[in-house]
């Protein structure tokens, strides 16, 4: 499986196929049992886990965004607007709905300005409009040379935004 510069590659597969495990291996969280992973620069990859609660350590959504933007308030607030989070800036991240939590996690990852994004079901819990906003933002990032490997069950999102898709069955692409 090769991820090219500026590409949005969606990885599809059933439950238990190994999609999340593959992302964890690519991000360095897990070691592969066999095979190997070749990186241009491993430190240039950002990982969005399926369970995003572990990403939040601050008291407010705004503080989380500022943390992701290295204190750049203009960038943080711009991302809040893009991800429809402006109405929640003073709320605690744990008080958000599932879709709002996903948007905050995606926003925080996107603010990290990584060259490779590994995203595990980022559209989970999002409404159609917010998925479209995320898809457009991801396409914009790809046009800037950022590569994205995105795990999803959302065929419509894949058809609308992916350059390519790969299928994973029992750990095999």
List the model feature ranges, each with a label.
Residues 158-160:
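A short, surface-exposed alpha-helical micro-motif characterized by mixed small hydrophobic
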Residues 27:
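Helix-to-loop junction immediately C-terminal to a conserved catalytic motif
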Residues 73-88:
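Conserved ABC ATPase "signature" region
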Residues 92-96, 100:
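Conserved ABC ATPase signature
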Residues 117-120:
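Catalytic Walker B motif of ABC-type/P-loop ATPase nucleotide-binding domains
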Residues 165-173:
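H-loop (His-switch) and adjacent beta-strand-loop-beta switch element
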Residues 152-153:
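H-loop/switch region of ABC-family ATPase nucleotide-binding domains
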């Amino acid at each position: 499986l090769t991820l090219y510069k500026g590409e949005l590659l969606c990885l599809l597969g059933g439950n238990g196929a190994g999609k999340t495990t593959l992302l964890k291996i690519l991000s360095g969280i897990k070691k592969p049992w066999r095979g190997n992973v070749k990186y241009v620069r491993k430190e240039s990859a950002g990982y969005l886990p399926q369970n995003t609660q572990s990403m939040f350590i601050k008291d407010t959504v705004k503080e989380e965004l500022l943390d992701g933007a290295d204190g750049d308030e203009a960038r943080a607030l711009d991302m809040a607007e893009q991800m429809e989070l402006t109405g929640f800036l003073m709320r605690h991240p744990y008080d958000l709905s599932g879709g709002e939590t996903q948007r905050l996690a995606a926003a925080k990852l996107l603010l990290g300005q990584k060259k490779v994004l590994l995203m595990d079901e980022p559209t989970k819990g999002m409404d159609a409009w917010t998925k479209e906003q995320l898809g457009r933002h991801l396409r914009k990032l790809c046009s800037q040379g950022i590569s994205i490997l995105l795990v999803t069950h959302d065929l419509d999102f894949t058809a609308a935004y992916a350059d390519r898709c790969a299928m994973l069955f029992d750990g095999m692409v």
